[in-house]
A protein has these predicted regions:
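Bacterial N-terminal signal peptides that target proteins for export
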Residues: 1-13
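Generic secretory/membrane-interface signal
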Residues: 4, 20-21, 207, 238
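Generic marker of residues within folded, mature protein domains
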Residues: 6, 15-17, 47, 207
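Bacterial N-terminal signal peptides
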Residues: 11-22
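Extended, histidine- and acidic-residue-enriched regions that form the cofactor-binding/catalytic faces
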Residues: 26-146, 150-273
């Protein structure tokens, strides 16, 4: 295939994805306004619920090392933004404040927990916070409470709490949804897309702070990227990077977030009666 033809195929693929789920500039969520609850008054939230916004989204992120080129709050910025996109597409949702402390493993975990700035919650503590947040929102009149997590360790606790509360509240008219496909299916779709479109291997894309993660933060919060520090695998074995962030772009980030949000919506709709 010639270079021109390859570029044409790549452009067509990108265009098709954008048509499926457009994210034009005016659709970018504003975290300092509704439907983000921390930017609303209690009376505005009350009136929104009374007006039919009875879905609550609880995003979970993380405070972890992301190499020399990317800020610690990567997951928080991405999942807060993605929750806004999810709320837009559902049309009847409000967003709780993002939980920024999540399980990150042992405090002294080599090349991870021992890096300055990493904050880790034990699984039981994380689950207690989720449990309390969901119970609080139930009291206020939300009928469907969504949990989405931007990091792998978040998924287990989300699933556990959703299962326990759904069993406890069976028949009460309130459902808790752990939308793990946002993370689990989302990352598979992103990886496959990058392989088919650019020919990039899974190793090149990486599993942490590589092409996908860096692209998403470039799209959501470009100030969180230190471009002069980007290097394949962070430039050293102890950098905390798996993959090649130099391949990242905001365009890829936009597509990646679309994949994740679409996977979450599909899972949510499949669970509805």
């Amino acid at each position: 295939m010639t270079t021109i033809m390859h570029r044409a195929v790549r452009t067509a693929t990108l265009a098709a994805l954008v048509v499926v789920s457009p994210l034009v500039a005016q659709d970018r969520p504003d975290p300092y306004a509704a439907p983000y609850m921390e930017s609303m008054t209690w009376t505005e939230i009350r009136d929104a619920i009374a007006g039919g916004k009875k879905v609550a989204i609880i995003p979970t992120g993380g405070t972890e090392q992301n190499g020399p080129h990317m800020v610690m709050g990567k997951h928080n910025y991405i999942v807060t933004f993605a929750a806004g996109v999810l709320a837009q597409r559902l049309g009847n949702a409000l967003i709780a404040p993002t939980l920024q402390y999540v399980p990150e493993g042992d405090y002294n975990r080599p090349n991870w927990g021992d890096k300055p700035g990493v904050i880790s919650l034990p699984d039981p503590a994380y689950e207690k916070v989720l449990d309390a947040a969901v119970r609080s929102l139930k009291v206020h009149g939300f009928t469907d409470i969504i949990l989405i997590g931007d990091s792998g360790p978040n998924q287990r606790g989300m699933t556990s709490i959703a299962k326990a509360l759904n069993a406890e509240w069976g028949g009460a008219g309130v459902r808790v949804h752990a939308l793990t496909d946002y993370y689990e299916q989302g990352r598979i779709l992103i990886r496959d897309y990058l392989n088919k479109t650019y020919g990039w291997s899974e190793q090149m894309v990486g599993s942490h702070a590589g092409t996908s993660d860096t692209s998403q933060l470039l799209y959501v919060f470009s100030q969180g990227i230190r471009k002069d520090k980007m290097a394949p695998n962070g430039g050293s074995p102890d950098a905390g990077v798996q993959g090649d962030p130099t391949k990242a772009s905001p365009e890829i980030g936009k597509i990646a977030i679309d994949f994740k949000v679409n996977a979450a919506i599909k899972q949510f709709k499949a669970a509805m009666p």
